[in-house]
Amino acid sequence: MKPKKKVVLKFDKRFVNDDYELLFNSSTGLELLQGVNGKDDPFSLCLPSLLDIGVMGTCKNRCQFCYQGHEQRPNMKLSDFMSIIDVVHQHTNQVALGGHGDPNKHPQFAEMVEYCRKHNVTPNYTTSGIELADDEIEISKMCGAVAVSDYEKNFTYDALKRFMDAGIKTNIHQIFDAKTFHKCTSLINGIDYWSGRVDIDRLNAVIFLLFKPQGSGKKMRFLIPTETQLEIMSDRILSPKCKFKVGMDSCLANHVLKYQTPSKLQAMSIDTCEAARMSGYITPDMKFKPCSFAECSTEVNLNGNLSEIWNESEPFKFFRDVLQQKSNTCPIGF
């Protein structure tokens, strides 16, 4: 009888306090969280392990469904971005560069990515791929992963190819709504909806994002998936037949877990809402709130101690209270 192989997990970043240990592998993105000193795994952290930073305030794409709306604001200042990283870098493992527009079009995009890596924080971002420049691809090699939003346009497929040609871990972000229901379920069933325009063998994953009737999307509530569509999607996404990996945002996961029970292995990688527990969002004008979809009334000005806002402000405590009562729910009703 052959002896069992011992599996050794390698991590290059560690945070530990009296309550928990947080381990991270910056190459694979694997994160391990566990209670210490006889304590259970924590419900929430002392700071976010994933921080969504809205570096962009401007966007010329004007997508009809944009949850950010079409109001144009100044982009985040590099000095503000650096001050955030200075505060959180010991605890925060990943930052998602986002906001109202393509992060790679920020004038200091390269400096932001480099500053993250200098402080052992892994940057990731999503882009439309429009007017993607060679130097943006080069700096993207320092990111953990890049996602391209699927607009089904030539610039979408061109961006995907160029990222993959550069050896960058590349994902597709696909909105799941009433209109894209057939496309999403087809992709999961292994049907090449892109008709060869995407190199499926090199694609890392397709991440399905639940449509949010927020911002400009408030006028498009007809895109909200029906209960039947959600139930079918929930069954398909846990039994994929495609070559690439499949993922979903926590907003969609909340609904999936209402209809399906994941396997033990799936349960380890499916997260319900993490807002105010494991993640938070900072706007281009330095307002800290539990998630990027939260209304303005839940914003907290980032003019004090970030840790104090995270742990003591009413918006963050409200989110945690709701999620503690029911994990697979949305505190703002999505």
Predicted regions and their residues:
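Flexible mid-to-C-terminal extensions adjoining Fe-S/redox cofactors in radical SAM and related proteins
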Residues: 1-19, 27-30, 285-334
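A C-terminal junction/extension of Radical SAM enzymes
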Residues: 1-9, 13-15, 205-290, 333
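Conserved alpha-helical substructure of the radical SAM core
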Residues: 6-17, 25, 30-136
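Hydrophobic beta-strand positions
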Residues: 23-24, 281
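Short cysteine clusters
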Residues: 59, 63-66, 273, 291, ...
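Short, solvent-exposed loop/turn segments at secondary-structure junctions
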Residues: 60, 131, 153, 177-179, ...
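Radical SAM/AdoMet-radical enzyme domain recognition
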Residues: 78-210
